[in-house]
Amino acid sequence: MNLFRFLGDLSHLLAIILLLLKIWKSRSCAGISGKSQVLFAVVFTARYLDLFTNYISLYNTCMKVVYIACSFTTVWLIYSKFKATYDGNHDTFRVEFLVVPTAILAFLVNHDFTPLEILWTFSIYLESVAILPQLFMVSKTGEAETITSHYLFALGVYRTLYLFNWIWRYHFEGFFDLIAIVAGLVQTVLYCDFFYLYITKVLKGKKLSLPA
Amino acid sequence: DSESKPKDEL
């Protein structure tokens, strides 16, 4: 494992825990898209079914279990515990426009036509667009709390670092996985606009708000 | 190669 990959995983973990803590401490999930969080829970579940079939390392197993557990906890906080604070009126992205095309694509473009491989591929495609309901919500309300911005930034940095990891692996190991790379590129591009706003506004101590 | 391997990435 190279440094980019490790820092990418840490950034991903930081994002997930940051969101959990934000909701827990403020006792509120205002401004958070429950739909994006459900999509991420689906992504982790579909991808990490190999927990039951394949042992890779203690690190790998622990991270997968933590990601899944945190993800389901977040969904539970939004739709059950702090349901009264959930901003459903602004969380109106139609997720079927993401789930259906990525599911069809996973059937058509995959490495191997087996159930686990198709589910893995589906999770890669779905992850690349799963943040759209959240970004849509931010654009609809025109603003995001600073801590939500930090969450989005850490989440975007994670896949960006994975891109460097893949360049590294291609160069030093001759390994590449085109499905992951293309989806990872799409995922990173979706964050670019947000990265710009984050760097120009949030890092200068301003709240992220979009021009009306 | 781009073939299916044990998935060591997260």
Curated annotation (Swiss-Prot), chain A:
The record marks 193 as: Important for recycling of cargo proteins with the sequence motif K-D-E-L from the Golgi to the endoplasmic reticulum. Changing residue 12 to A: Loss of recycling together with cargo proteins containing the sequence motif K-D-E-L from the Golgi to the endoplasmic reticulum. Residues 204-207 are annotated as: Important for recycling of cargo proteins with the sequence motif K-D-E-L from the Golgi to the endoplasmic reticulum. The record marks 5, 117 as: Interaction with the K-D-E-L motif on target proteins. Changing residue 209 to A: Inhibits coatomer/ARF-GAP recruitment, receptor redistribution, and intracellular retention of KDEL ligands. The modification Phosphoserine is found at residue 209. Its main location: Golgi. Changing residue 127 to A/Q: Loss of recycling together with cargo proteins containing the sequence motif K-D-E-L from the Golgi to the endoplasmic reticulum. GO terms for molecular function: ER retention sequence binding; KDEL sequence binding. The keyword Endoplasmic reticulum applies. Changing residue 32 to A: Decreased binding to the sequence motif K-D-E-L. It comes from the Eukaryota. Residues 47-48, 159-169 are annotated as: Interaction with the K-D-E-L motif on target proteins. The chain crosses the membrane at residues 5-24, 33-52, 59-79, 93-110, 117-135, 150-168, 179-199. It is a multi-pass membrane protein. Phosphorylation by PKA at Ser-209 is required for endoplasmic reticulum retention function. Keywords: Cytoplasmic vesicle, Endoplasmic reticulum, ER-Golgi transport, Golgi apparatus, Membrane, Phosphoprotein, Protein transport, Receptor, Transmembrane, Transmembrane helix, Transport. Residues 1-4, 53-58, 111-116, 169-178 are lumenal. Residues 25-32, 80-92, 136-149, 200-212 are cytoplasmic. It is found in: Golgi apparatus membrane; Cytoplasmic vesicle, COPI-coated vesicle membrane; Endoplasmic reticulum membrane; Endoplasmic reticulum-Golgi intermediate compartment membrane. Coiled coil: none annotated. Receptor for the C-terminal sequence motif K-D-E-L that is present on endoplasmic reticulum resident proteins and that mediates their recycling from the Golgi back to the endoplasmic reticulum. Binds the C-terminal sequence motif K-D-E-L in a hydrophilic cavity between the transmembrane domains. This triggers a conformation change that exposes a Lys-rich patch on the cytosolic surface of the protein. This patch mediates recycling from the Golgi to the endoplasmic reticulum, probably via COPI vesicles. Belongs to the ERD2 family. PANTHER family: ER LUMEN PROTEIN RETAINING RECEPTOR (PTHR10585). This is ER lumen protein-retaining receptor 1.
